[in-house]
């Protein structure tokens, strides 16, 4: 279980209030699919994923990215129980979708990069560290059913 300090919780909550869930979610998922093309196999119903521009402009990628970041928003409201928050999604991704749990870590890292790009100098090392801790905790919670 990940333990967040009061300062880390405040940093994450403050940053999250400024995140554009739709835009950043779509960009993060799109970048994941471009940079790690083997992850595309989990999205075969999304239509054209043949190029970076097709992926980044794909409405299904954008919609699912928004859904992913909305789930992360729920986790931020429940930072003390990430495992419980993601129990159902962990089961779904493990038992039904058979997603490699390493992909959760990859997406988290891509999300941190997207946030750093969007926030620029405002994205301090302290903010990055708190975000990395958060996405690592979420990745671990999502991988829980695999163990």
From Swiss-Prot:
Superkingdom, natural source: Eukaryota
Entry's transmembrane regions: none
One of the record's GO molecular function terms: oxygen carrier activity
Positions contributing to heme b binding: 64, 93
Record keywords: Heme, Iron, Metal-binding, Oxygen transport, Transport
Family annotation (InterPro entries): Globin (IPR000971), Globin-like_sf (IPR009050), Globin/Proto (IPR012292), Hemoglobin_b (IPR002337), Hemoglobin_oxygen_transport (IPR050056)
A cellular component annotation (GO) from this entry: blood microparticle
Entry keyword Ligase: no
Residues in Globin domain copies: 3-147
Tissue-wise expression: Red blood cells.
Biological process, per Gene Ontology: hydrogen peroxide catabolic process
Keyword Transport: yes
Subunit: Heterotetramer of two alpha chains and two gamma chains in fetal hemoglobin (Hb F).
Function of the protein: Gamma chains make up the fetal hemoglobin F, in combination with alpha chains.
Assigned protein family: Belongs to the globin family.
Protein name: Hemoglobin subunit gamma
Gene name of this polypeptide: HBG
């Amino acid at each position: 279980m990940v333990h967040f300090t009061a300062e880390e919780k405040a940093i994450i909550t403050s940053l999250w209030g400024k995140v554009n869930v739709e835009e950043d979610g779509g960009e993060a998922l799109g970048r994941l699919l471009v940079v790690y093309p083997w992850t595309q196999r989990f999205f075969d119903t999304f239509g054209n994923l043949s190029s970076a521009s097709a992926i980044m402009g794909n409405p299904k990628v954008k919609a699912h990215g928004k859904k992913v970041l909305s789930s992360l928003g729920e986790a931020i409201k429940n930072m003390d129980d990430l495992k419980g928050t993601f129990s159902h999604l962990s089961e779904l991704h493990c038992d039904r979708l058979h997603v490699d749990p390493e992909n959760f870590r990859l997406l988290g890292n891509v999300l941190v990069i997207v946030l750093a790009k969007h926030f620029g100098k405002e994205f301090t090392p302290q903010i990055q560290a708190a975000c990395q801790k958060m996405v690592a905790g979420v990745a671990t919670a999502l991988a829980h059913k695999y163990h």
